[in-house]
Amino acid sequence: MKKEIIKWSKDFETGIKAFDDEHKILVKTLNDIYNLLNEGKRDEAKELLKRRVVNYAAKHFKHEEEVMEKYGYPDLERHRKTHEIFVKTVIEKLLPKIEEGSENDFRSALSFLVGWLTMHIAKPDKKYGEWFKEKGIVIEDEAVKID
């Protein structure tokens, strides 16, 4: 039976459908990685993490930042910096830990990703959602597709 390490919640909704859909993909991906680890499929979990968490998150971040820039979101630079720090942390610290470390190291990295995503969606992402709503800006973009 599939388990969830992170459960999607209405509390995560930004009010921007495309971004909420992208966040749901990231949440599902972390749950898929968790289940692959529990099934002893560490190599598949690693590949999924690289393909979806690293690559898809980068596309998602770019999408968010482009929309924020287009509409003049005032906290764009801070938000962009948060994304840059996350990507750098994943590439420089988590990926080597996952590649070379034990299963516990992998699980620790996964816990970090869950915590970061939860906090990031619940705070800075909700903040931009509220800003767009206050300004009466409706985003009609489609969610970035999975490769």
Swiss-Prot record:
Keywords: Iron, Metal-binding, Oxygen transport, Transport
Protein family (similarity comment): Belongs to the hemerythrin family.
Molecular function terms from GO: iron ion binding; oxygen carrier activity
Top-rank lineage group of the source organism: Archaea
Function: Oxygen-binding protein. May be involved in a storage mechanism or for delivery to oxygen-requiring enzymes. The oxygen-binding site contains two iron atoms.
Quaternary structure (record): Monomer.
A Pfam cross-reference name: Hemerythrin
Residues binding Fe cation 2, per UniProt: E64, H79, H83, H120, D125
List of residues binding Fe cation 1: H23, H60, E64, D125
Protein name: Bacteriohemerythrin
